[in-house]
From Swiss-Prot:
The entry's keywords: Cytoplasm, Heme, Iron, Metal-binding, Muscle protein, Oxidoreductase, Oxygen transport, Phosphoprotein, Transport
The protein's role, per its UniProt record: Monomeric heme protein which primary function is to store oxygen and facilitate its diffusion within muscle tissues. Reversibly binds oxygen through a pentacoordinated heme iron and enables its timely and efficient release as needed during periods of heightened demand. Depending on the oxidative conditions of tissues and cells, and in addition to its ability to bind oxygen, it also has a nitrite reductase activity whereby it regulates the production of bioactive nitric oxide.
Annotated InterPro entries: Globin, Globin-like_sf, Myoglobin
Binding site for heme b: H94
This protein's name: Myoglobin
Signal peptide: none
Gene: MB
Subunit architecture: Monomeric.
Catalytic reactions of this protein: Fe(III)-heme b-[protein] + nitric oxide + H2O = Fe(II)-heme b-[protein] + nitrite + 2 H(+); H2O2 + AH2 = A + 2 H2O
Amino acid sequence: MGLSDGEWQQVLNVWGKVEADIAGHGQEVLIRLFTGHPETLEKFDKFKHLKTEAEMKASEDLKKHGTVVLTALGGILKKKGHHEAELKPLAQSHATKHKIPIKYLEFISDAIIHVLHSKHPGDFGADAQGAMTKALELFRNDIAAKYKELGFQG
């Protein structure tokens, strides 16, 4: 299920565009997640009160958290599948503290793909989308394996 060198290059090329405006991308990804899957908001005490897209766009905390999420993901993607050291603490916190189900990671992966396609259609065609989808699936599968080691049935 690994990615070829060419696929990793496509992932990292588009990720460079994300990093140019990581706060904006992170905010859009979380808004897409929360509006598409409102149940995910229940895992975020500081965002539960945000009911509309306008409220979400106005939230500096949401923008900051989007930056944290995409910064962590970028660090993992840059490891090109060799992300054990980065993944372990992330899986630990998401399994034991936050109790984030794997399904929610699928939801945010879909949100990432959607946001990248809408913001960068010229740089995120079918091949790049396929590569990013594979990279995010690899990440989720590895998180799921760590969850299992930790006894979390997320």
